[in-house]
């Protein structure tokens, strides 16, 4: 479990997170929603151990996450940032292999990297120059890198995948495929923390949603109870209508 206890983050006299209490459990998909500047990405970086809190603590399996070495953390959690810039002409496969580490399970890193590319519908991109790929293709390659990192770290303990706006460059087909993959990983015991802007996607795939604004958690819960017209109005300052999906019965958000 990753546990944030009374976490605040202050940078340059500006409060980015304030008194955050949150737990990410293995085997669940948690989606964080909120307007620009709400603190979503800051929370992800803090939970991942990349940004130390100014106050409070982040624990991984009841131990301060700051006590884990980078090598230990890399086996336990993988992070997909909003943007990754590479200035050298690596192939897509070489980028994915950057996520590989000496496996604890004896698996072949190259085979796992190829499998990860296939998982995100990017196997045909393996030998392409990463710099020549479209934004969506690069995003899928980076997702494959994160998968490879997790797969080559199997055996170190419960694992977590942190996704910061992973659908931003993807078309509709690959948005859906990515979130189905996140659900699949959660079903296998991975704790997935995902930052999104799309309320509809969050409602259809999340086990739990965090609604953030001004560095605080405004509401937390299952999509069916959290996605309400009142919450949408409070956080986004827009009026909406909430209807049940005809198949899943999960909430669908329509902005007036």
Curated annotation (Swiss-Prot):
SUPFAM superfamilies: P-loop containing nucleoside triphosphate hydrolases. Its EC number is 7.6.2.-. It is found in: Cell inner membrane. GO terms for cellular component: plasma membrane. The keyword Isomerase does not apply. It is a peripheral membrane protein. Keywords: ATP-binding, Cell inner membrane, Cell membrane, Membrane, Nucleotide-binding, Translocase, Transport. Disulfide bonds: none annotated. CDD domains: ABC_Iron-Siderophores_B12_Hemin. PROSITE patterns: ABC_TRANSPORTER_1, ABC_TRANSPORTER_2, HMUV. Pfam families: ABC_tran. Residues 2-239 form the ABC transporter domain. One of its GO terms (molecular function) is ATP hydrolysis activity. It is an enzyme of class 7 (translocase). Its main location: membrane. It comes from the Bacteria. ATP binds at residues 34-41. Part of the ABC transporter complex HmuTUV involved in hemin import. Responsible for energy coupling to the transport system. The complex is composed of two ATP-binding proteins (HmuV), two transmembrane proteins (HmuU) and a solute-binding protein (HmuT). Belongs to the ABC transporter superfamily. Heme (hemin) importer (TC 3.A.1.14.5) family. NCBIfam families: PRK13548.1. This is Hemin import ATP-binding protein HmuV. It comes from Hahella chejuensis (strain KCTC 2396). The lineage of its organism: Bacteria, Pseudomonadati, Pseudomonadota, Gammaproteobacteria, Oceanospirillales. The gene is hmuV.
């Amino acid at each position: 479990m990753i546990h944030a206890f009374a976490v605040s983050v202050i940078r340059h006299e500006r409060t980015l997170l304030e008194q955050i209490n949150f737990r990410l459990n293995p085997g669940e998909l948690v989606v964080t929603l909120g307007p620009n500047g709400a603190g979503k990405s800051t929370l992800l970086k803090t939970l991942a151990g990349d940004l130390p809190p100014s106050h409070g603590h982040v624990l991984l399996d009841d131990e301060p996450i700051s006590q884990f070495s980078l090598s230990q953390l890399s086996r336990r959690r993988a992070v997909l940032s909003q943007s990754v810039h590479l200035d050298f002409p690596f192939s897509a496969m070489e980028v994915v292999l950057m996520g590989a580490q000496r496996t604890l399970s004896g698996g072949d890193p190259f085979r796992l990297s190829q499998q990860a590319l296939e998982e995100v519908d990017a196997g045909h991109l393996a030998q392409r120059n990463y710099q020549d790929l479209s934004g969506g293709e690069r995003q899928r390659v980076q997702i494959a890198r994160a998968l490879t990192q997790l797969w080559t770290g199997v055996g170190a303990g419960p694992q977590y995948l942190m996704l910061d706006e992973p659908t931003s460059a993807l078309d509709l087909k690959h948005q859906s495929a990515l979130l189905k993959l996140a659900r699949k990983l959660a079903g296998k015991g991975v704790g997935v923390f995902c930052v999104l802007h799309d309320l509809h996607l969050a409602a259809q795939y999340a086990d739990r949603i965090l609604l953030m604004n001004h560095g605080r958690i405004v509401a937390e819960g299952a999509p069916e109870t959290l996605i309400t017209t009142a919450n949408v109005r409070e956080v986004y300052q827009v009026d909406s209508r909430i209807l049940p999906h005809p198949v899943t019965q999960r909430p669908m958000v329509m902005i007036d």
